[in-house]
Amino acid sequence: MATLLYRIGRFAFRKAWYVVAAWVLVLGALLGTGLALGGQTQESFTIPGTESQQTIDKLENLFPSAAGAAATVVIVAPDGQSVNDDTVKQEISDVADDLGNLDQVAAVVSPYSEYATNAISEDGTTALLKVQFDGPATDVTDATLTQVTTAGDTLDADGMTVAYGGEVFSNQTFGLTITEGIGVLFAGIVLFITFGSLLAAGLPLLSALIGVGVSFAGITLVAAFTSVSSTAPMLAIMIGLAVGIDYALFILSRHRSQLARGMDAEESAAQSVATAGAAVVFAGLTVIIALLGLLVVGIPFLSVMGVAAAFAVFAAVTIAITLLPAIMGISKGKLAPKPGSRAARRAIAAASHDDEKTDAATPASPASVTSPSAGAAEIESGAPAKPAESANPAESAKPTKPTKPSLGGRWVRLVMKAPIVFIVAVVGLLGVASIPAFSLDLNLPTAASQPEGDSSRIAYDTIADKFGPGYNGTIVVVADITQTTDIQNDLAGIRSDLEAVDGVATVGPGLPDETLDTAIFQVVPTTAPDAPETKALVERLRDMKGEVEAQYGTPFTVSGQTAVAIDVSNQLSNALIPFGILVIGLSILLLAMVFRSIAVPIKAALGFALSVGASFGVTVAVFQNGLFADLLGVHSTGPIISFLPILLMAILFGLAMDYEVFLVSGMREEYVKTKDARRAVRVGFQHGARVVTAAALIMFFVFFAFVPEGEGAIKAIALALAVGVFVDAFLVRMTLVPAIMTLLGKHAWYLPKWLGRILPNVDVEGESLREHIEEREWARRHDGAVTAEDLAVEGSGAPVSFDIPAGSVAVITGETAARRLIGAAVAGRIAPDAGHLQVLGHCLPSESGPVAKRVTLVDLESRRPDATTTVGDALNERLRLGLPWFRRVPQGDTEELIGRINGALAGIEGETPIDIHRTLGELTPLTQSLLAVALGVADRSDVLVVDAGDGDFAHPSTPAFAGAVASIADRSTTVIIGLESEPASHASTVGDRALVRIALPGADPGDADLSSSSPTASKGGPR
């Protein structure tokens, strides 16, 4: 992965303006389309298959008007007047008539209608006007809602107070607010303190804002076609903004650190994306996987939220590894810390420390690579060294004063002195913070969670005050009356039984449908929809189903807002533990792959559980119990939104793994180099502490900004995430982790051998990139077409070295299996197991893709020609592969290849010329082989590798084979031929082309002295 990211970073740097233009086009297209279609969110929480949802679905068929969306117009008479006054009554009735004439309105029930039930408050000051739409809330247009409010607002002019409630008025068109600005402001302050540069501080903000724009536009577009919760876009923006800034911070820190140490800007950008970017991709993928894991829960609205947030994270990751290096390419070396600055001194000191660790006698090259944790090097501790890209050489030579030990260094030393004390303190503190979580009460959001002053909140509060809290959440009982013979009396009896249930305020009369199959009862509880007593009432109503059915023969189901909330909460509660096991299990597996350890992932998972518990506890204490509610701008307390626990686990999991990787990867790198466990903890912590601190503070401020200024359910989610990030970063990762790692010592890095063989090796630390850069530097020192040094492929025998100049002919002799393996490695088809190998300037195996495109491999032993195919057809088919589908193969190309074959056959005893009409079955084995070579030549590759296998034509009795192959290939093509043994006369058959002889260990070198005929001939090859 690191090598792929290295190439992406280098490409983005070189093609900076193209990459920037591409992102501008993507953002513009999404924004333009999304805003043109005008997506709208809604508070719709349903779970297919639950009793409440099945009841709603049934009502849609039997009572279409009752199943449609509803709105309540709450009208309060002017002071000193009553809604029963003739003037007020007439005005309200006129508005009801106007509403009834609107499109999409199925029915309007005036508070004075005979069908109205308890629509006027006891004190006569408030009336409820019911508006029933002909479809679900998603179908009600903005134009219709505007017409409803316009008609109702005419009462305001007459001194009445009007508010609008119901699901349709909980829908929200969303947009960016001051909340995001507050988070960005705090993030900018942290970034400026971290980098000490406005330009550097602005880049993470810019990339994050572009990511937020892309995700915002995408969700707006999707909301125009499907139901999207109003929480989803704000959650996506909040997550996208936080991770977007953090991911850019990690990569940019690495880049500035390398620039300060003198690395070329392009190389630095590529390596930053490859190392820190690899950790970013890993962290982003864990968040995305966890969020997409919400799909398995089977709750549509939660799935949409998970996908929306995952898309925001995907956008943040993609921008960090593409757009950010492009901006680095535009900025060139301007992002380097100023020579002599604190950032420069720290970065240089970290480089000096790394050199001291590895080999004091070997100077660090500009292409040296460190782990992603060193991305924070510029903001760690250090000593003076040469600054990067200094315009004034004398300035570079100025002595710089050493920096004091960093706060992170002092902190980790303190923790390591008394690890048990810190472990007990952290676990005890987080355990106490988790206690309120045991009283966690889950429910769906109601209008009570809307901001004060919002119309739906005013309507909700007015109804609760004037009619009773239960009127905001009517329970619907749907009875099947197909088996009753006395409908009227049975419905009256059921109503009486329902009224007798504890917690019921009133019950409306049973209303049968037109076919007398089903009847509905409106049950008004005495308590609010989200009250525990109302939940208990729903359960009591459901418990009496058997009794009612036995007495009246009428089975019934229970639905309504509270019933839906109970079903949703139950479904979420049932999914919470399996999902938690899945998330924690995933974390253990992923970290075991990354760190090659058992203890590290188990410790990380336990720390994650502590963070989640503390986050739950604090959220319950504030939003449910009211602790510090006023201080935090929480204006109403009550149950926690049902999907918060599972959503928090998904998001916090990824963020926790993010910090774990950046801290512990440095520890692992140090331990691998020194085998000193205590030193590894100290040095690794110092490498990553400052950047993790900055990242955690940014996330905390971004999330926390949504608490006092956010809307609805997002406030609780924001607080939970803010607390979770703070606890996980500062108490768990930066205190508990070094304490536990100190106690475990070298046992922290133990991994059973059998498990190590099973687990894939995730190269987050960039080890493959180090190897790639070393191989690339080695390849640049050799100008031959193919060069190998101590090359070994499993099954090929002892290592071999050789150097094949461009345009020469090389003959490899040895066992067939060994030759074929070496040939396949040269062609980029298989990876070498050891040694160095370069082909046409590309190092293998990391650049096997370009090599495979420029090298043709012809394995004669594996050929299976169709005896009935003609020579012309075989050549035309191969030549056609290299042409566009609409072009024909020029006849001259086919004739040219046949001419080359005949030229090679000329003078070979027993061989005759061929033409396009000869079938392959009519050809001799040697001619068939030369035709196969010609098919390979048709690819016009720079290197042609031919292995003769065990064919008779490869016997020394056919000495002209090498010359025949060489004459078919272009003179500029480097030809490598594999034979069992090489006759002496091969040297003369290749003409004036250089001949290189390579004898694999154990091969018969032949009886020729090739030194006089081949100026580059070698055995083993030059080094």
Range-by-range predicted roles:
Residues M1-G39, V105, P136-L440, G553, ...:
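Membrane-embedded transmembrane helical bundles of large multi-pass transporters/channels
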